[in-house]
Regions:
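Rhodanese-like catalytic fold shared by cysteine-dependent sulfurtransferases
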Residues: 2-6, 15-27, 31, 54-85, ...
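Extracytoplasmic/periplasm-facing segments of secreted or lipoprotein envelope proteins
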Residues: 29, 36-41
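Short coil/turn segments at beta-strand junctions that form active-site/ligand-binding loops
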Residues: 40-44, 79-81
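Short hydrophobic beta-strand that contains or immediately precedes a catalytic carboxylate
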Residues: 43-48, 61
């Protein structure tokens, strides 16, 4: 019985940690993101790699792959400023790498754009191409 109780406690803890991690970086909707872009109150981080970044990115996004060593220099001074990371699509979790790095620098308003570049393109929104 003690083993069973210990197993249940362990499973419960694991599930609660997984659930907490899932919402660690809340999603931002397409309309919220475009409003923040229009107001110029967001820093966007593309986590798709440099080749993908040059092939098409959300306008104004920075390339995480080229900034890893100097990410802090590309971010706003205000640690409460909105920072949004995105990757390929809704199934992609690569955004977490950048989001965690940003949070580790002390930023408190870190979100992710779940549809990623695929969803952005599917919405008909413009993309930037080439080097920044």
């Amino acid at each position: 019985m003690k083993r069973f109780s210990a197993l249940l406690c362990t499973l419960g803890l694991a599930c609660s940690l997984f659930a907490a991690g899932k919402d660690e970086f809340p999603a931002i909707s397409h309309s919220e993101l475009t409003a923040a872009m229009t107001a110029q109150t967001v820093t966007l981080i593309d986590v798709n790699g440099t080749a993908s970044y040059r092939n098409g990115r959300i306008p104004g996004a920075i390339d995480y792959a080229t900034l890893r060593g100097d990410l802090a220099a590309a971010l706003p001074k205000d640690k409460g400023a909105l920072v949004v990371a995105y990757c390929g699509n809704e199934k992609c979790q690569a955004y977490r790498t950048a989001a965690k790095a940003v949070a580790a620098l002390g930023y408190t308003n870190v979100k992710h754009y779940s549809p990623g570049i695929a969803g952005w393109r599917a919405s008909g929104a413009a993309v930037e191409k080439g080097a920044p």
